[in-house]
Structures are given as C-alpha cells and as structure tokens.
Regions:
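Alpha-helical segment proximal to the catalytic Tyr-Lys
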Residues: 130, 176-180, 238
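Active-site loop of short-chain dehydrogenase/reductase
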Residues: 12, 85-87, 132-146, 180-183, ...
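Catalytic loop of short-chain dehydrogenase/reductase
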Residues: 142-166, 171-172, 176-180
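Short C-terminal tail/terminal secondary-structure segment
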Residues: 1-5, 99, 212, 230, ...
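A short, exposed helix-loop element centered on a Lys and neighboring polar residues
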Residues: 125-126, 172
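Substrate-binding pocket helix/loop in short-chain dehydrogenase/reductase
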Residues: 100-102, 106-114, 206, 210
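Canonical Rossmann dinucleotide-binding motif of NAD(H)/NADP(H)-dependent dehydrogenases/reductases
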Residues: 3, 7-39
Length: 254
C-alpha cells in the first residue's frame, strides 16, 4: 500500500518508537512509503537493523533506547533532526509484562507497565513539544492506547489497561496544552492486532474467545494500524487534536 506523500511528511523526519515490534515496524514502513526519513527507536535488544533493511527511501536511522530512562529523550529528537526537520512522533512503544489476576500482580508488574506505558509517554510527548516549539514546527504526536482503556482489559491485563487509560487522558490534556503552539496530539486505540503481544500472551482458547467478540471476525494486521497513524501525523488532519481513533474492527463502539 502506498501512502500519499503530499501531506507534509515527504522529505521530513519522523520518530517511531517501538519500531522493532509488529505495529511499530509497520508504522515505520508506512512513513517511509510516504517519503519520510524515519528514526527507528526501540530497546537495545529489538531487531532495528532488520526493520531498517525493509524501509524504502533513504535517510533512515536507528537509535537503541530504553524509553524508561528519561535522560535519553532529548537525544531522540536531536538524532532525528540530523536527517531533516522533525515533523511527527509516532509513539508505538508499550509493554504488557504478563497476564495476571489482580491478586497475582506484583510491584514489578506495576512499575514496568506504568513506567513504559505512562511515564515515558508523558515525558516523551513533552520533549517532542519542546523540540517542535524551539524549531517553529507545527508538529504532530500520535500516541498508542488500547481498547483496554475503555473495557478495563481482558484476560488478566488490568494494569496494562489502566496504563492505556492514562495514555488517553494524557493525550487529551497534552493536546489542550500544546494547541496554542499549533502542535497536535492524538492517539490510536487498537483492538486485537496479530502481534506477539496479543497472540503470545494467551492460550488458543482465550484467543478464540477474544476474536469471537470482534464483529469483523478476525484480528487486525499491524499494517491496518498504519493508515490512521499516517492520517493523524500528516497535514491531512491539520485541525484534529485530542482525539482517539478507535481501530478495533467494531469490537468497541461508543
């Protein structure tokens, strides 16, 4: 699928976090097809070089980075700016440590998911805003939530769901704060997506039960997350901010 390259993305830099994973790597390829120069960001163990080889175009870079280490956030945008003006952040990075009942959740489960999914989101968004404002860029931030923010999570994912609810609230609050500077903040809220996070944390029976609740009768592919991200990151959505795009195959209707 080819994305239009006339909506402010072609020739400019974008940052994609979680770029070594299923959704993040698909989003990175979508931006590359739109003509962007992509900075791939993920934890050091992620296969960033493998993803880099799949991108069309030139000027792409990788940056291994633990987003829970806030000191590294400024380096992300400085690195991306080496290639071209940074116009967008697609923050796809997230972690579901494990599925656990409420009684089985440990402090380590809580801390990791809140640190990565909420704390890193807030501070990375703030750093993106500072970079955009300093450079006079009307940039766009696209965060990733989950339908769990609305449902409370399925199958032992209450902490993950809570952290994604925080992403929705912060997206709205940050959108309001950044709007006077012309900087937009939106979120994509996927339902079930065919990635290791989804399929690797459930039994076949649990997965079949989950899929049975999706009106479209299947999981999404990672590539089906790309269109909403490209739209929200580009000037095609220049008057859209503070919104949450529900991409769940009809499972979540509100």
């Amino acid at each position: 699928m080819k994305w239009r390259n006339d909506a402010g993305l072609a020739g400019n830099s974008v940052v994609v976090t979680g770029a070594g994973g299923g959704i993040g790597s698909a989003v990175a390829r979508g931006f590359a097809e739109a003509g962007s120069k992509v900075l791939l960001v993920d934890i050091p163990s992620a296969p960033l070089n493998d993803v880099l080889k799949t991108l069309t175009g030139t000027g792409h870079q990788i940056l291994p980075c633990d987003l829970s280490d806030l000191k590294g956030h400024v380096n992300i945008f400085e690195k991306a700016a080496e290639a071209a003006e940074v116009v967008a952040l697609a923050h796809c990075a997230a972690v579901l440590r494990r599925r656990a009942t409420v009684d089985d959740v440990t402090e380590e489960d809580w801390d990791l998911q809140i640190d990565v999914n909420m704390k890193a989101t807030f501070f990375l968004n703030r750093t993106a805003h500072a970079h955009f404002k300093k450079n006079g860029t009307k940039g766009s931030i696209v965060n990733f939530s989950s339908q769990g923010w609305w449902t409370g999570g399925f199958g032992g994912s209450v902490v993950y769901a809570g952290s994604k609810g925080g992403v929705v609230s912060m997206t709205k609050g940050l959108a309001r704060s950044f709007a006077p500077d012309g900087i937009r903040v939106n979120a994509v809220s996927p339902g079930g997506v065919d990635t290791s996070m989804m399929t690797g944390n459930q039994t076949p029976e649990q997965l079949a039960s989950f899929v049975s609740m999706i009106p479209m009768g299947r999981l999404a592919t990672p590539e089906e997350m790309v269109g909403p991200v490209i739209f929200l990151a580009s000037q095609a959505s220049s008057f859209v901010t503070g919104t949450v795009a529900n991409v769940s195959g009809g499972q979540l209707m509100y």
